Amino acid sequence: MKQGIHPDYREVVFQDSSTGFQFLSGSTATSDETVEWEDGNTYPLIRVEITSDSHPFYTGKQKFTQADGAVDRFNKKYGLSND
């Protein structure tokens, strides 16, 4: 592996902007902001819009309205029933 061409891989804290949920993970992302983690160490803070704490797939608040409409149109077009 060539030296000096790869970004630094280190532990960073990701924070969900909508819920405030934070988790520690490894990343090459950089940030000027830092935060003190539960272990007492200071890590770079990366703010993200969506995490597993706020994404509808993980929270169970999914909406399938668009997909359901497509299925209904298909069934109607080909004379199929939804049973």
UniProtKB/Swiss-Prot annotation:
Pfam families xref list: Ribosomal_L31
List the GO biological process terms. Answer: translation
- Can you provide one Gene Ontology molecular function annotated for this UniProt record? structural constituent of ribosome
| Entry keywords, A to Z | Ribonucleoprotein, Ribosomal protein
Q: Which GO terms describe its cellular component?
A: ribonucleoprotein complex; ribosome
Q: What family name appears in the similarity comment?
A: Belongs to the bacterial ribosomal protein bL31 family. Type B subfamily.
PANTHER family listed in its UniProt record: 50S RIBOSOMAL PROTEIN L31, CHLOROPLASTIC (PTHR33280), LARGE RIBOSOMAL SUBUNIT PROTEIN BL31C (PTHR33280:SF1)
Q: How does it assemble?
A: Part of the 50S ribosomal subunit.
Question: Would you tell me the protein name for this molecule?
Answer: Large ribosomal subunit protein bL31B
Its taxonomic path starts at:
Bacteria, Bacillati, Bacillota, Bacilli, Lactobacillales
